[in-house]
Curated annotation (Swiss-Prot):
Keywords: Ribonucleoprotein, Ribosomal protein. This is Large ribosomal subunit protein bL32. Pfam families: Ribosomal_L32p. One of its GO terms (biological process) is translation. InterPro entries: Ribosomal_bL32 (IPR002677), Ribosomal_bL32_bact (IPR044957), Ribosomal_zn-bd (IPR011332). It comes from the Bacteria. PANTHER family: 50S RIBOSOMAL PROTEIN L32, LARGE RIBOSOMAL SUBUNIT PROTEIN BL32. GO terms for molecular function: structural constituent of ribosome.
Amino acid sequence: MALPKYKTSRANTHSRRANWKATAAATVNCPNCGAPALPHMACPSCGNYRGRTYRSAIQPAHTK
């Protein structure tokens, strides 16, 4: 296996890692209630997706 011949400086390391960053999640407004939701997912506030309500699938079946 190849080994580095010289130590990588802090400046080179930091400049290389400067582009390695997280991107914010894209959100869209729900057409039913207007709350922000992830695209292609059911709305967390009203449970609608593509004209159908999936709220019963989101809530737990049994509550004690």
